Regions:
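Structural signal for conserved beta-strand scaffold positions within catalytic alpha/beta enzyme cores
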Residues: 8-10, 113
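Extreme N-terminal starter segment of soluble prokaryotic enzymes
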Residues: 2-7
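Active-site HxH/HxHxD metal-binding segment of metal-dependent hydrolases
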Residues: 46, 52-127
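Conserved beta-strand hairpin/beta-sheet module of binuclear metal-dependent hydrolase folds
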Residues: 13-75
Length: 127
């Protein structure tokens, strides 16, 4: 069986209300949440799980406070020796914008998502 190493890449951060992330706790408190993509290293294909946010602004004190180096997509890939066009396969956990905004930069990649997720993405519920 093939062994992979999972390399987390912090590609963006979102500021949100804590209550959205911690059910019934912390409503009204603003928190920063890192947005991750994961590079699966070890096989013949260059595989990413999610691609993160394309554009974001994170105050420098946030990176320092949480001890995270939050990088643009291309810079994050460079930390593992890759460029967007090197990616062969993108696997999506789901199709929220903070998981798939950099897909179009991976011009040689095949993109995989669950069928139901894709159907909803193409025809969302009207609000």
């Amino acid at each position: 069986m093939r062994e992979y190493v999972i390399r987390p890449l912090v590609i963006g951060a979102n500021e949100t209300d804590q209550g959205i992330m911690t059910y019934l706790r912390g409503y009204g408190q603003r928190i920063w949440i890192p947005i991750y993509a994961f590079y699966l290293e070890g096989g013949p294909e260059k595989i990413l799980v999610d691609t993160g946010l394309e554009q974001f602004m994170v105050p420098p004190e946030v990176s320092k406070k949480y001890g995270l180096e939050i990088l643009e997509f291309e810079d994050a890939l460079a930390t593992v020796g890759l460029r967007p066009e090197d990616i062969d396969l993108i696997i999506h956990t789901h199709l929220h914008n903070d998981h798939c905004e950099n897909d179009t930069k991976c011009t040689n990649a095949t993109v995989i998502a669950q069928r139901k997720e894709y159907e909803f993405f193409k025809n969302p519920h009207p609000i």
